């Protein structure tokens, strides 16, 4: 039985809990929860019987196999570091935090030292198994073009000086490297960091705001000395949080489910 602790009892934390309770994730249980908002943690606890923890320190001392970070980019370092030090594997949803190379290397080296694992879901994109194989050759180019409804990008657009209501046609609102992309669109473009980590190559990112779009669209291009990969995925927005894709939540569910299963498919 896989014993799970959840840090962050919002949309993703609730979705994972739902999939444990309905049997989609088999041989697993939610054992402990923590959120700065006590009421959110209480709601999850009442549904699962999980212990409500008073802090991250409290949670990582519980008898857990896996800690799920579903909180925020800012919380990743504390959650991941304390989980690993306390001999827990950790699943990171806010992958954008790992655009900070120093943090990525710090957590990677810590996991190696303590003999634990850091899991990064594929999120709203596909093809990562092929990309990991392609990087065994020489990666030459990695490009991610993301198109989302204006409403999904609204907060970031306002911060950049756009008036979302004035966008009547598709417009490129960002073009640059993965590091700048995650700073300007922290709630929308975690996949660019996941892609860059998989390729071990910094992605060029293009973000398009489309007032007519109903789906979140990701177009990947990866060129390697071994071959070239093109992938296009159109995702339904996540109902509980339209800034991201439903596939991002389901990818975490699938990863956790695989951890509890005896057969692993794919690279």
From Swiss-Prot:
Active-site residues (renumbered) = 218
Q: Give the EC number.
A: 1.4.1.21
This protein's pathway: Cofactor biosynthesis; NAD(+) biosynthesis; iminoaspartate from L-aspartate (dehydrogenase route): step 1/1
The UniProt entry, under InterPro entries, shows: Asp/hSer_DH_NAD-bd (IPR005106), Asp_DH (IPR002811), Asp_DH_arc (IPR022487), Asp_DH_prok (IPR020626), L-Asp_DH (IPR011182), NAD(P)-bd_dom_sf (IPR036291)
MF-aspect GO terms: aspartate dehydrogenase activity; NAD binding; NADP binding; oxidoreductase activity, acting on the CH-NH2 group of donors, NAD or NADP as acceptor
Q: What class of enzyme is it?
A: oxidoreductase
Which residues take part in binding NAD(+)? 124, 190
Q: Which Pfam families match?
A: Asp_DH_C, NAD_binding_3
Q: Which GO terms describe its biological process?
A: NAD biosynthetic process
Q: What UniProt keywords apply to this chain's record, in alphabetical order?
A: NAD, NADP, Oxidoreductase, Pyridine nucleotide biosynthesis
Question: Which Gene3D superfamilies does the entry link to?
Answer: Dihydrodipicolinate Reductase, domain 2 (3.30.360.10), NAD(P)-binding Rossmann-like Domain (3.40.50.720)
This enzyme catalyses: L-aspartate + NADP(+) + H2O = oxaloacetate + NH4(+) + NADPH + H(+); L-aspartate + NAD(+) + H2O = oxaloacetate + NH4(+) + NADH + H(+)
The entry's other comment says: The iminoaspartate product is unstable in aqueous solution and can decompose to oxaloacetate and ammonia.
What family is this protein classified in? Belongs to the L-aspartate dehydrogenase family.
Its function?
Specifically catalyzes the NAD or NADP-dependent dehydrogenation of L-aspartate to iminoaspartate.
- Protein name, entry field: L-aspartate dehydrogenase
Which species is this record about? Methanocaldococcus jannaschii (strain ATCC 43067 / DSM 2661 / JAL-1 / JCM 10045 / NBRC 100440) (Methanococcus jannaschii)
Lineage, top ranks: Archaea, Methanobacteriati, Methanobacteriota, Methanomada group, Methanococci
């Amino acid at each position: 039985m896989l014993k799970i602790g959840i840090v962050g009892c919002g949309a993703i934390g609730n979705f994972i809990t739902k999939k444990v309770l309905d049997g989609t994730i088999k041989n697993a249980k939610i054992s402990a929860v923590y959120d700065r908002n006590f009421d959110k943690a209480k709601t999850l606890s009442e549904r699962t019987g999980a212990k409500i923890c008073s802090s991250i320190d409290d949670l990582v001392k519980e008898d857990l196999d896996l800690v799920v970070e579903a909180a925020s980019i800012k919380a990743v370092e504390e959650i991941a570091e304390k989980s690993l030090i306390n001999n827990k594997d950790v699943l990171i949803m806010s992958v954008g935090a790992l655009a900070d190379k120093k943090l990525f290397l710090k957590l990677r080296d810590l996991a190696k030292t303590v003999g634990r694992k850091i899991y990064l879901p594929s999120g709203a994109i596909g093809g990562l198994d092929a990309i990991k194989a392609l990087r065994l050759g020489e990666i030459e180019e990695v490009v991610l073009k993301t198109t989302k409804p204006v409403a999904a990008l609204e907060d970031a657009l306002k911060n950049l000086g756009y008036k979302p209501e004035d966008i009547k046609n598709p417009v490129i609102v960002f073009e640059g490297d993965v590091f700048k992309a995650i700073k300007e669109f922290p709630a929308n473009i975690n996949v660019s960091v996941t892609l860059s980590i998989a390729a071990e190559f910094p992605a060029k990112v293009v973000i398009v705001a489309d007032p007519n779009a109903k789906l979140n669209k990701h177009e990947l291009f990866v060129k390697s000395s071994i071959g070239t990969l093109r992938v296009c995925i159109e995702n339904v927005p996540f109902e509980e949080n339209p800034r991201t894709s439903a596939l991002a939540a389901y990818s975490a569910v699938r990863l956790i489910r695989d951890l509890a299963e005896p057969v692993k498919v794919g690279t």
